[in-house]
Design a protein with these regions (language model features):
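A structural signal for isolated positions on well-ordered beta-strands in alpha/beta enzyme cores
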Residues: 137, 158, 184-185
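Conserved acidic residues
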Residues: 148, 157, 181
């Protein structure tokens, strides 16, 4: 269905396959349009951007932009992260990319599910697609220390780190603590509070959302 839709829009299925393959290989990793274009067979950066935005406008994946702390908004010129909207969409993209499910992708898919839930609760214009989010972002320091999500919720920025593991150490939330002074760490099954940082299982967090 996806391939036939793209062909109706006069898009190339080989380019779609190569872009899908690169997206699946780079889940939760910031990408540049140039880098994605080179890895998709050396196509033009604008072509890579167009295909990704079509996937996002088709509700198949969402584009997570870098969060500018001073402006409290996206920085479109920075690298962005791409996530399938749903684990089932991962399988759709895997079929397009002619690859099989990689179990190593599970933590990244869980991260993507968290992002999807945050979008549903913070974004007001999802009917226009997932290419231009205005309240859900990621953040990375000049030393390449990353926070998985930063959401603007009722005017407040809330940093969220997904650590899908049972054992959590202070090093797992150092970046949130130093850069934001507060935040949530979503774990596999661990709870903890520590000086403005609160840890709870992903499942509990998703259950508590409206």
């Amino acid at each position: 269905m996806v391939i036939s839709d793209f062909e109706k829009w006069r898009k190339d299925r080989i380019i779609l396959r190569d872009i899908s393959r690169r997206i699946l290989a780079s889940l939760s990793t910031p990408l540049s349009w140039n880098g994605l274009a080179q890895d998709a067979g050396g196509i033009a950066a604008n072509t890579a951007k167009e295909y990704v935005q079509l996937l996002a406008d088709s509700y198949l994946l969402y584009i997570l932009e870098f969060f500018n702390k001073s402006r409290k908004s996206a920085s479109p010129n920075k690298n962005r992260k791409l996530y399938p909207f749903d684990p089932l969409i991962y399988l759709v993209l895997a079929q397009i990319a002619n690859t099989t499910f990689d179990h190593r992708a599970e933590p990244h898919l869980i991260e993507g599910v968290v992002g999807e839930a945050l979008m549903r609760n913070t974004e007001t214009e999802l009917f226009e697609g997932f290419a231009r989010l205005t309240s859900t972002f990621y953040w990375r320091s000049t030393r390449d220390k990353e926070v998985d999500f930063v959401v603007l919720w009722n005017g407040e920025e809330i940093p969220i780190e997904v650590k899908y593991q049972s054992r959590i150490s202070p090093s797992d939330y150092t970046t949130i603590k130093r850069s934001f002074g507060k935040g949530l760490v979503l774990t596999k099954d661990a709870f903890f509070p520590e000086s403005g940082i609160y840890g709870l299982p992903v499942a509990c967090f998703l259950y508590l959302l409206p």
